[in-house]
Structures are given as structure tokens and as C-alpha cells.
């Protein structure tokens, strides 16, 4: 019964069935904002006996305060964010967004979704151009997205960076900075992202670049040093 309900939820949230033969556990890949968390919460409420775990445990039921279990070697029914570490035995399903992990060979999914309520069309166009993906936005509103000169323009909102040399430089100039890794699963209205080079990071550090560019909900200001280095010559 839990498998049937899961398949119904995947269909209702427009997940696409792949050509992989049906097997257990069901592998489900979806971009942030596609409904993965909501699906997990709904199946947890419908079948409270299920053991649902994650490497970054999230809330399952706001009324009871029930959270996902922290992953150990013990078997689970559902594993969220399965690329986060060594997997125990999983019976029913594994969920993940491969774009948020540096994994060259994630499991072949049974179901996928690139439809998002999280990112507007401006953000999806940016992400698709950088990462070569095909994310589609379901949002009607538009966020504010700008490319700023890091040498002449002050940041707005929360300053985010993940490269240590960039973090050190910002701190030397008295600019408070939040490492991208500390913002996992969070969104902030206005974000200023400082990075060395989008082109190089899209090859060598795709996961952290993706996370850095997807923390905002209203405005994203990108400060890319290499894009403006000629201005200092």
C-alpha cells in the first residue's frame, strides 16, 4: 500500500517515469522545489510506521515535531538525500537532487522531475546556461538577478561564498560572510554571492556553485571576480 501511494504522489507532482525497469528501492531524482519534501511528508503522515531517514534530517510533521531519522547502518524504508553518505539497506525509496552533490555516477533513477516552484524563470535560465540542465519554473513572479563588480559595488543582503580564498578576502575587508555549506536547505530573501569564476567552478566544483546560486528567494547578486578582473588593470 505504501508503494502504491508513493507512485500516486509521484504522478500527482508530475514526476516522469524513466526507462529503468521497476525495482526496489525506487530511485527518485528531483530538482529543489519539485515537491520531494512534500511527498515524503505526505507518505510519512499516511504511514507513520515507516522509518524515514536522511543525512540532514528535516521535519516530517510540524504538528508533532517528528523529524527524519539520522542515518546509521540500520535499515530504512525511505532515505532522503541518499547521495549524502554511505547508504544502509533501503526498502521503499531513495530521494535526491544530484545537482546539489559532487557525484559523478548517481544511481539511475526510476522517476525524475525538473519542474520547480523554488526558482523563477530568470534563475532557471541562469542555471540551465551554466550547468546544461533543463529546469523549468512554475513560478509566475520574477526574482531580481544582477551581475555586479566586486571591486566597486557593495553587497546587499546576506553575503555567501564557498571558496576559502574568497572567504578570507572578504573577512580581511571586514565583510561578514556565510559559507554556502552552512545554508544547506535554507533560502534567504536577498543574497550576494562572491565567486572567482563561474566557468571554472562549473567544471571543478559544480555542487557548491549550484548551492551558492540557489539560496535566494527574491534577489541574487553575483560578484564574479574573473569577470571584472580587467577593470583593475
Curated annotation (Swiss-Prot):
An example molecular function term from Gene Ontology annotations: RNA binding
Coiled-coil regions listed in the entry: none
One Gene Ontology term from the biological process aspect of the record: transport of virus in host, cell to cell
Keywords for the protein's UniProt record, in alphabetical order: Host cytoplasm, Host-virus interaction, Inhibition of host innate immune response by virus, RNA-binding, Suppressor of RNA silencing, Transport, Viral immunoevasion, Viral movement protein
Subcellular localization: Host cytoplasm
Cellular component terms per the entry's GO annotation: host cell cytoplasm
Domain (+)RNA virus helicase C-terminal: 135-233
Top-level taxonomic group: Viruses
Domain (+)RNA virus helicase ATP-binding stretches: 1-134
Ion transport listed as a keyword: no
Membrane-crossing residue ranges in chain numbering: none
Keyword ATP-binding: no
Protein family (similarity comment): Belongs to the Tymovirales TGBp1 protein family.
Protein function: Transports viral genome to neighboring plant cells directly through plasmosdesmata, without any budding. The movement protein allows efficient cell to cell propagation, by bypassing the host cell wall barrier. Increases plasmodesma size exclusion limit. Acts as a suppressor of RNA-mediated gene silencing, also known as post-transcriptional gene silencing (PTGS), a mechanism of plant viral defense that limits the accumulation of viral RNAs.
Further information: TGBp1, TGBp2 and TGBp3 seem to act together for cell-to-cell propagation. TGBp1 is the main movement protein that physically cross the plasmodesma with the viral genome. TGBp2 and TGBp3 would facilitate TGBp1 function.
Subunit (UniProt): Homodimer and homooligomer. Interacts with capsid protein. Interacts with host AGO1; this interaction targets the host protein for degradation, thereby suppressing the antiviral RNA silencing.
Record protein name field: Movement and silencing protein TGBp1
Species of origin: Narcissus mosaic virus
